[in-house]
Amino acid sequence: MKLEKKKGIGAKRRGKKSSIDHDPFLEEETEKRRKFNYDDDDDIESVESEEEGKVGEEVEDEFAHETVGEKRKRLAEDTLNRIEEAKQREHEEDNEEDDDFRDSLVAKTLMQEQLEKSGRVRRANALRVQDLQSSDKFRVIVKHQHSVTGVALSDDDSRGFSVSKDGTILHWDVSSGKSDEYKWPSDEVLKSHGLKFQESWYTRHNKQSLALAVSSDGRYLATGGVDCHVHLWDIRTREHVQAFTGHCGIVSSLCFREGTAELFSGSYDGTLSIWNAEHRTYIESCFGHQSELLSIDALGRERVLSVGRDRTMQLYKVPESTRLIYRASESNFECCCFVNSDEFLSGSDNGSIALWSILKKKPVFIVNNAHHVIADHDSVNHNCTPACSWVSSVAVCRGSELAASGAGNGCVRLWGVESGSSAIQPLYELPLPGFVNSLAFAKSGRFLIAGVGQEPRLGRWGCLKSAQNGVAIHPLRLS
């Protein structure tokens, strides 16, 4: 595919490759790294008391002066020790186990993790999903006053986050559904955190959120919406810490690069901006879309997938300052997500779902009319419009071929993405009334959460009064 060189995305970066660990199972994919980058395991566990907070500060001070090489070596040793301890606990009753066998288990585990992370091996979760039982259905665990516009899960699947058109940001427990609300600070505090008030009174005082993202280490929550700012929150304290300025339009989508503090934001001004949450700084902006940017997604590599109202889907290769452009022929893109580093899914306003390859300009497989309007959603009783069949959300269970899509037709559909045959196979339909504006799989594949509401995420093109505004969870039984 032709690579279109894009000026203005920013200067190329130069970085050093890690030479600390020569074990092939520990090495990451070769890539140019930015100045601001950190590792998956460099995190601080959330604290509930002041004493635990002080302990965390002491730990930070202890490693404050170590070099990058020392830090990577320490993290690698911690990872090896943790895996060895886990394997030893699993086989502690086996007296005949020797050191060579334990080493082989550690190497096998590291190899599997690296292959899954790079996308070379995927778990067969789609084949493991068992037939649904009568008790298996969506259950609303968190309620909002207005339509939910975004949902996300922490890396350990224990906590969830949701935002809605009512401006509330909720942090909730997956098992119990108990939620806590993030409190917006005063205008003076927001101004001290970098917020620039707009001339428009509506924009200035509107805290309506349309997108959110959670960092892999569970330290930062990013939200964005009508006020044209990207807001950064500390998950440990649930306090507002920074307001990133720079977008001239509504912030419509957010995502973190896996394993880093690098944050991507898409806006109605057509730009894709890059920030560093840990250092709370702006890095650069990527250009290319000629209209509003609607949805973005990213994995571990420095590549960002985006779709916009200009009927294009673009894959930005940030270090090389290049991008690949994929065009929709008959419809507008509504959402997108990565399947792996070389394949991705898109949802359109004509009700179709498409599977794309990085090597081809056209989709390799299309499911037409994926979300047809079912009988219970007739226009008389539920004010159903053509917007009900728009595919407003797609999600993939990371490291597997299990995917899901949502619209306003009354159900969430599960799919199996077959890379070898380049096909999408339908699996199950999960009834859920309302507009499904956001989806997220648990990393284990054991459940699926959906942000649902009476209205679509980015407008008021339809209204389903029978729907409930909130976050719904559906268990998935794997064999």
UniProtKB/Swiss-Prot annotation:
Transmembrane segments: none annotated. Keywords: Nucleus, Repeat, Ribonucleoprotein, RNA-binding, rRNA processing, WD repeat. Residues 18-38, 52-73 have a biased composition (Basic and acidic residues). Disruption phenotype: Embryonic lethality. The keyword Metal-binding does not apply. PROSITE patterns: WD_REPEATS_1, WD_REPEATS_2, WD_REPEATS_REGION. Its main location: nucleus. Residues 1-73 are annotated as: Disordered. Gene3D superfamilies: YVTN repeat-like/Quinoprotein amine dehydrogenase (2.130.10.10). WD repeats lie at residues 143-182, 204-243, 246-285, 288-326, 328-366, 386-425, 431-471. GO terms for molecular function: U3 snoRNA binding. Residues 39-51 have a biased composition (Acidic residues). It is found in: Nucleus, Nucleolus. GO terms for biological process: rRNA processing. InterPro entries: Rrp9-like (IPR039241), WD40/YVTN_repeat-like_dom_sf (IPR015943), WD40_repeat_CS (IPR019775), WD40_repeat_dom_sf (IPR036322), WD40_rpt (IPR001680). GO terms for cellular component: Cul4-RING E3 ubiquitin ligase complex; nucleolus; ribonucleoprotein complex. Component of a nucleolar small nuclear ribonucleoprotein particle (snoRNP) thought to participate in the processing and modification of pre-ribosomal RNA. Essential for embryogenesis. May function during late embryogenesis. PANTHER family: U3 SMALL NUCLEOLAR RNA INTERACTING PROTEIN 2 (PTHR19865), U3 SMALL NUCLEOLAR RNA-INTERACTING PROTEIN 2 (PTHR19865:SF0). Belongs to the WD repeat RRP9 family. This is U3 snoRNP-associated protein-like EMB2271. It comes from Arabidopsis thaliana.
